[in-house]
Amino acid sequence: MIQPQTYSNVADNSGARKLMCIRVLKASNRQYAHIGDVIIAIIKEAVPNMPLKESEIVRAVVVRTCKELKRDNGMIIRSDDNAAVIVDQEGNPRGTRVFGSVARELRQLNFAKIVSLAPEVL
């Protein structure tokens, strides 16, 4: 579960390293974001000499959370960290690589490009 003021890692090579969530999209009073949700975040830590800079406001898709995700078949998916992939307005990833595993639910939520870049799909 990611709420405003939550720090998360960036799971791509766009140049950012840490994000801080400032808003959960898709609902007016929704408090938490789960896997597959789009958030608005601020870049808190970035790699030098890259296109994305610190204190820049970006959109990101949550790909891993510490809070478990329960599937209909009884499987539970849990990660060691909160991670997100930075996307543009159309939902395409800004980076060219995705690090770490992503959940299969992203494919059903029309983030197939993120799933195709990921090395492991759970």
From Swiss-Prot:
Residue stretches spanning the membrane: none
Gene Ontology molecular-function annotations: large ribosomal subunit rRNA binding; structural constituent of ribosome
Disulfide bonds: none
Location relative to the cell: Plastid, Chloroplast
Alphabetized CDD domains for the sequence: Ribosomal_uL14 (cd00337)
Pfam family, one: Ribosomal_L14
GO cellular component labels: chloroplast; cytosolic large ribosomal subunit
Gene3D superfamilies (alphabetical): Ribosomal protein L14
UniProt KW keywords: Chloroplast, Plastid, Ribonucleoprotein, Ribosomal protein, RNA-binding, rRNA-binding
Top-level taxon of origin: Eukaryota
GO biological process, one term: translation
Entries under InterPro entries matching the protein: Ribosomal_uL14, Ribosomal_uL14_bac-type, Ribosomal_uL14_sf
Main location: plastid
Subunit structure: Part of the 50S ribosomal subunit.
Sequence similarity: Belongs to the universal ribosomal protein uL14 family.
PANTHER family attached to this UniProt entry: 50S/60S RIBOSOMAL PROTEIN L14/L23 (PTHR11761), LARGE RIBOSOMAL SUBUNIT PROTEIN UL14M (PTHR11761:SF3)
Function: Binds to 23S rRNA.
HAMAP family (alphabetical): Ribosomal_uL14 (MF_01367)
NCBIfam families: rplN_bact
Name the record gives this protein: Large ribosomal subunit protein uL14c
Gene that this polypeptide is encoded by: rpl14
